[in-house]
């Protein structure tokens, strides 16, 4: 089993500091949504994010990169064979568990609506089957709750290795940063296996794709 943990993901509802912002309120009215139930999205709110969080404006509000990653993982051969578990840990220490049977909406706007429902309801079901669930948890507590043989952190400052050199057919937990720039907010010092897979910056979904594809080969699926 491969456990993919997307850590410190920039997926959150509108922070309290921003909820009175006129541009945010206009956008909420346009969508017929309560401000505090909308997901922060820099595609539409970059100017407001830059106003309230000037040092983080290039990082925060990136649900789009989580969407692209989940589109790939949930449609992978590994997931179809029930050998992949994906978890999204957010910057606010919320953990989203993605059921293997869950398929992401093909529309980004529908994805946003789905996850806004999740933030409000904490669980999404279909015909009695759980698709998504959310709980409060730190990264460390999440990792400790998962049975695995090895824990690996992917980090630009890690040892440079090809994925095929460190991925085996064991129960592996791999931590990938859920942000577009910067470093982890959560403590990751307890993870000793640290690797970089390329000498240039990669998107988080391309990194996840490399992990999934190499694990598929390790277990003989491809």
Swiss-Prot record:
Record-annotated disulphide pairs: none
Superkingdom of this protein's organism: Archaea
Protein name: Ribosomal RNA small subunit methyltransferase Nep1
Site positions per UniProt: Stabilizes Arg-62: 64
GO biological process terms on file: rRNA base methylation
Marked site (Interaction with substrate rRNA) residue numbers: 62, 103, 106, 110
Main function: Methyltransferase involved in ribosomal biogenesis. Specifically catalyzes the N1-methylation of the pseudouridine corresponding to position 914 in M.jannaschii 16S rRNA.
Documented EC number(s): 2.1.1.-
Coiled coil: none
HAMAP family given in the database record: NEP1 (MF_00554)
Catalytic activity annotation: a pseudouridine in rRNA + S-adenosyl-L-methionine = an N(1)-methylpseudouridine in rRNA + S-adenosyl-L-homocysteine + H(+)
Gene3D superfamilies, per the entry: 3.40.1280.10
PANTHER family per record: NEP1/MRA1, RIBOSOMAL RNA SMALL SUBUNIT METHYLTRANSFERASE NEP1
Entry-linked InterPro entries: Alpha/beta_knot_MTases, Rbsml_bgen_MeTrfase_EMG1/NEP1, Ribosome_NEP1_arc, tRNA_m1G_MTases_N
Binding positions for S-adenosyl-L-methionine per the UniProt entry: 177, 182, 197-202
Organism the protein comes from: Thermoplasma acidophilum (strain ATCC 25905 / DSM 1728 / JCM 9062 / NBRC 15155 / AMRC-C165)
Gene: nep1
Family the UniProt entry places it in: Belongs to the NEP1 family.
Quaternary data: Homodimer.
Molecular function GO labels: rRNA (pseudouridine) methyltransferase activity; rRNA binding
Keyword annotations: Methyltransferase, Ribosome biogenesis, RNA-binding, rRNA processing, rRNA-binding, S-adenosyl-L-methionine, Transferase
């Amino acid at each position: 089993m491969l456990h993919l943990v997307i850590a410190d993901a920039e997926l959150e509802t509108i922070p309290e500091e921003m909820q009175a912002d006129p541009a945010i309120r206009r956008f909420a009215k346009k969508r017929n949504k309560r401000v505090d139930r909308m997901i922060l999205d820099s595609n539409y709110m970059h100017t407001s994010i830059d106003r309230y969080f000037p040092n983080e404006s290039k990082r925060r509000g990136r649900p789009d990169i989580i969407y692209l990653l989940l589109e790939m993982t949930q449609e992978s051969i590994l997931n179809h064979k029930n050998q992949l578990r994906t978890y999204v840990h957010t910057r606010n220490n919320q953990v989203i568990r993605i059921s293997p049977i869950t398929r992401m909406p093909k529309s980004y706007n529908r994805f946003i609506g789905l996850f806004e429902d999740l933030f409000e309801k904490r669980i999404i079901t279909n015909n009695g089957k759980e698709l998504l669930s959310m709980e409060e948890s730190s990264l460390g507590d999440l990792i400790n709750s998962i049975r695995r043989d090895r824990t690996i952190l992917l980090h630009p400052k890690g040892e440079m290795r090809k994925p095929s050199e460190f991925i085996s057919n064991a129960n592996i937990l791999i931590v990938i940063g859920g942000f577009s720039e910067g470093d982890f907010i959560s403590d990751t010092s307890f993870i000793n296996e640290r690797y970089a897979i390329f000498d240039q910056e990669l998107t988080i979904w391309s990194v996840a794709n490399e992990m999934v594809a190499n694990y598929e080969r390790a277990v003989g699926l491809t």
